[in-house]
C-alpha cells in the first residue's frame, strides 16, 4: 500500500501524521509512505528525523494580521504552483490513499487527490474544526476526530471518533525516570516541572518561569523549559537572574519521551495533540491556551477538561500573576495531581493511531 500524508505548519499537524505512519509501517513493512508539507516549516526537519521522506510545497497560510494583510495578495499564485507540483507528486507516487492531518500545508494535496479520485481520510485534532479540514470535508471518505459533537462541522456519516494519535514512546510504560533525570542533568527525588510553549514557542510563559527561578529553587523544584527556537536567543541575551543547576532551558526538546518521564507536572499550551500526549503520558497539567489561534480553538480544547476536573486552566493574560503560584500549589497537592491524571486519562480514547491505520486499510 502506498500512502501520502499531508499537513503541517505546527507540531499539532505534524506529529499525528508521524504516529499514523509508524503504525502503518508496523502493520506492514512493505507499506510506502510519503509526506507532503510546506517548504521551510517544521515538518521539513521533523519528518526526516522520524525516518520518512517528505516533499515541500511553496504554500503559505493566510496572514490574519491587518498590517500584513497585503502579503495575502500572492497567495493564489502559491496555491496554483503547489497544485501543479502536487499533481506531479501524485502521478509519480501513485498513492492508494491520501491522509490529511490539517493545516494549510495539506490543502493542495487533498484537493488534488480528490480531483484525481483517490480515497481521502482526514484527521481533525481539535474541538473546533480547522478551516482547511472544513473546506475539504466534502471530498473525504472518512473524518477521524478526537472530540464528540464534531458532526456540527462535518457530515455525520463520515465522522469516526478515534481520538488523537500520539507518538509511540508515549504509550511505552517502561520506567525511564532515572535515565531521564540523568539525560537532563537533574536530581532524583525532587519535583520536576516540564514547561512547554508549543512547537512555535510562547514568550510570556518562558519569561514568567525564568523570572521565578529563585522561587523554584527556594521550594526545591527543578524545571525543564522548552522555549521554542523563536525565543531562545532572546532569553539568552536578556538579563535574567542566574539559574541554579536544576533549571534547564532548551530551544527544543529532542527526547520528549525522557522529558515526560522526568516530569511530575506539565505546563503547556492547549493544542489538541499536546493535550493528548500529556494524557497518554499520565501527567497532571496546567494548560495555557494560546490567544493567537483561529477561533480561540485552544480554549475550546481545554474547557471540556476543566469541567471534568481533568485540567487546570490559566488564561494567557493571567500568566504573570497566576502561573507560578498555581505550579507551587499543585506541587504540594499529591491528591490533586492523582485526580487530574485519572480524569484526564478518562477523557480520551487510547490506541488512536492503530484505529486510524485499521480504518485506512479497510478503505483501501
From Swiss-Prot:
Keywords: Cell cycle, Cell division, Cell inner membrane, Cell membrane, Cell shape, Cell wall biogenesis/degradation, Glycosyltransferase, Membrane, Peptidoglycan synthesis, Transferase. It is found in: Cell inner membrane. The keyword Transmembrane helix does not apply. One of its GO terms (molecular function) is undecaprenyldiphospho-muramoylpentapeptide beta-N-acetylglucosaminyltransferase activity. Its EC number is 2.4.1.227. It catalyses: di-trans,octa-cis-undecaprenyl diphospho-N-acetyl-alpha-D-muramoyl-L-alanyl-D-glutamyl-meso-2,6-diaminopimeloyl-D-alanyl-D-alanine + UDP-N-acetyl-alpha-D-glucosamine = di-trans,octa-cis-undecaprenyl diphospho-[N-acetyl-alpha-D-glucosaminyl-(1->4)]-N-acetyl-alpha-D-muramoyl-L-alanyl-D-glutamyl-meso-2,6-diaminopimeloyl-D-alanyl-D-alanine + UDP + H(+). GO terms for cellular component: plasma membrane. Belongs to the glycosyltransferase 28 family. MurG subfamily. This is UDP-N-acetylglucosamine--N-acetylmuramyl-(pentapeptide) pyrophosphoryl-undecaprenol N-acetylglucosamine transferase. It comes from Amoebophilus asiaticus (strain 5a2). The gene is murG.
